[in-house]
Amino acid sequence: MWFTYTFAMLLVAGYVSAYGSGAPQSACQDMIPRHPVGPQNTSAPYIITTSTKVVKAGTPMQVTISGKKPENTMRGILLQARQGDKIVGKFTLDDNDSFAQLLDCGEPGNAITHKRHPPEFDKQTVTFTWTPPADLNDNIRFRATIAYSGAVFWLGVESPVVKVVA
């Protein structure tokens, strides 16, 4: 029993170490982290909010991921804007952002993931800037995978609909 527990913990530690510096590109479509455990089947203790419910195409807006309680911090994230299942738009970050980095999921900067950081720099709230394509005229949702730890994560956390108008 002790051996099984130790082996399982080493596997989790290996995956956390492997992807501690952000989601791999192989997770872009299904947004499933390549951890050796499955997602939580409970309601996520996180919410995604936006600075507006309607945005003009090509105009930047803010998107925020927050824990519902102070103890609901984030170790890792994968965030995208989706028009149906299509990844759309582009995120921008400050060069000195200590938590997040851009990820290329088919287009440069169309997703955000976490950087490697010590646990004391986990975040309870993060805000990013996203710009819809200049020719988009449709509804989108922000979709995220949010990890509390390497072994505890939630898939499919979504924002309310945002209408993008041309």
UniProtKB/Swiss-Prot annotation:
Residues 1-18 form the signal peptide. GO terms for cellular component: extracellular region; membrane. PROSITE patterns: REELIN (PS51019). It is found in: Secreted. It holds the Pfam family Reeler. In larvae, expressed in fat body. Keywords: Antibiotic, Antimicrobial, Disulfide bond, Glycoprotein, Immunity, Innate immunity, Secreted, Signal. Residues 19-166 form the Reelin domain. Disulfide bonds join C28-C105. Its main location: secreted. Induction: In larvae, by bacteria. Coiled coil: none annotated. The keyword Signal applies. Glycans are attached at N41, N96. GO terms for biological process: defense response to bacterium; defense response to protozoan; innate immune response. Belongs to the insect defense protein family. PANTHER family: CELL WALL INTEGRITY AND STRESS RESPONSE COMPONENT 4-LIKE-RELATED (PTHR45828:SF9), CYTOCHROME B561/FERRIC REDUCTASE TRANSMEMBRANE (PTHR45828). May have antimicrobial activity. This is Putative defense protein Hdd11-like. It comes from Manduca sexta.
